[in-house]
Amino acid sequence: MENVYHKFHIPVMGTGHSIDSPIRVAHLGISSVMSIVDDILIEKICKHYSQKYSIPVEEVAKSDLYARSKRITSYLNLVDKIVALKLNELKLLPFAKGNEKTKYFELLPDDSSLKEKYKSFLKIENEEEKEITAKELTELMHAGSIDVNIMSKVDRTNYAKDGSILSDEFSDAKAALRGYAESTLTSSIVFSAGFNRTLLGFLAQFKDFYRDANGKIKKKIIIKVSDFRSAMIQGKFLATKGLEVSEFRIESGLNCGGHAFASQGFLLPSILQEFKDKRSQLAKEFIPLIKSYYEKQNWRFNESDFNCEPLLTVQGGIGTSGEAKRMIEDFGCDSTGWGSPFLLVPEATCVDDDTLSLLMNAQKEDLYLSGASPLGVPFNNLRNTGSENWTKDRAESGKPGSPCPKGFLISDKQYTDKPICTASRQFQKNKVEEISAMQIPESEKDELKNLWYAKVCLCDHLANGALIKLGISPKTKSPQSICPGPNIVWFNRQYSLQEMTDHIYGRGESLVSANRPHMFCQEIELYVNYFEKLLVTIGSSEAEIKYLEIFKENLENGIEYILKISEGKAYPNENLKSIPDFVKVQQDRLKSMYAKRTPLAIAVNF
């Protein structure tokens, strides 16, 4: 995060909603993350921006064995050029009220050294001194980081035209990694959704992930984690290959957008406190392993280059400046991630108008943890999207499932030799026939069928909103999906980038109601809801009962810790006083549902 002046970043959102965020905001110093899982979408977006900025991009032949990685590299190189172009144009501007150059500095946090220098500049009356300071400020302008994300779970094996399996380097995630590694970007790659050893091991093939002769790393590694143990395991694995984790990005398991990877009842404050208490262990454990690798390779190991701890950032459900300040001041985080609120900032993200309207008008009941993902992982969803309606219409017309045009999420081999997607027409036809043949009541058959009908073609539909917004695809042929976190309900209109940034930094009037419960309340409720579903879906074996008991104990301990936090002093724009009464309701729910539990040995399906 060198030369990054802001205390927040815009996380990855879907495959398409932040696909061009760096083009929109990086020249203004704001860092954001793009998904690089969908090279088909990326190729279309690349063509669009190549034409818009008159920057030629070489077309990649479909027959090219490295087509996927080359498409990704082409787009990332294009984004790099566009951001550099926009930043240079910004630098050439004079400091004038209301222009983009002034906006760059107005967006900065008030306590940053660059903002203070800018404020001092505004007070200078001597023209010569003002001109010198203006040049100094201009030289200090840097773009936000153009970061990318790979979901570690999305790592499909690919096949040659003759049906033979291609070598591991051509799997989806590794090809995407190659695409980033061979780009011109100096930024970071975020790995999310679990620990993929072969994927992380593939990093060692590319020199940009190692320190150069000057001790600098061109491409840094960020690991998204949900607990300290995961950070330690993945960090050690990388260290044995001489690779450093520059940042651990901690995310709430349920109070987030997209796929939800619930912890075993651990709430965010407890997780953050453990990171704070044990932070020094990270570098202490990793550096000796990195040093050993360097020595084996006969590389120079400069102690001073390695005497820093990984950065810690946090995201998931943060909705006020006070909550963000607590993350930084009390838990020692270096910055915060703000995702879903930026879906309502057209200057920053790419959301089609119909979906934008749904987001602005969304009520609590419109946001739900669904079984829509073909990965079998709970998925944060919004009701009445084009995707949801399209999926329902197909099921009701007797033609359930998607043609599966992209196939990134294929994983099931119940009916085929090669994996297929559970949202596909092929899978659902087989599944419906299987259910229809079962000797059970028709009502139960319908219930089982509906569980599978709920699966959505996320590969295609998460990309469509961006294609519609940019005028690349018509909305009549592009059902659009979106995956906001529950926090979006407190934001109810379109916002300018200045408004949202001011809200994050606590400048001016808050964009959310003063009655909004604290983010910790939201997370508690989500975990109690999740536990309630576990009680009626998990089996009755000794191991499963033990799992429930540990989950409940962790949840109760986390709630007690949050109550303790609520007794302290609140930061401005932080609703700590909402916690005690809210917690009492959830504690009563938890106690009541556990007393009435009737575990059933059926599959979990959220």
Model segments located where?
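Membrane-targeting and insertion segments and their boundary/processing signals
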Residues: 15-19, 208, 260
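Extended, well-ordered protein cores
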Residues: 169-223, 234-240, 247, 251-258
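Short, basic, glycine/proline-bearing loop/turn elements
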Residues: 159-163, 217-223, 310
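Short, composition-biased local secondary-structure segments
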Residues: 144-150, 199-210, 280-299
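Long, compositionally biased, glycine/small-hydrophobic-enriched stretches that function as flexible linkers
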Residues: 1-199, 366, 370-606
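Glycine-rich phosphate/ribose-binding loops and adjacent secondary-structure elements
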Residues: 223-233, 239-391, 396-397
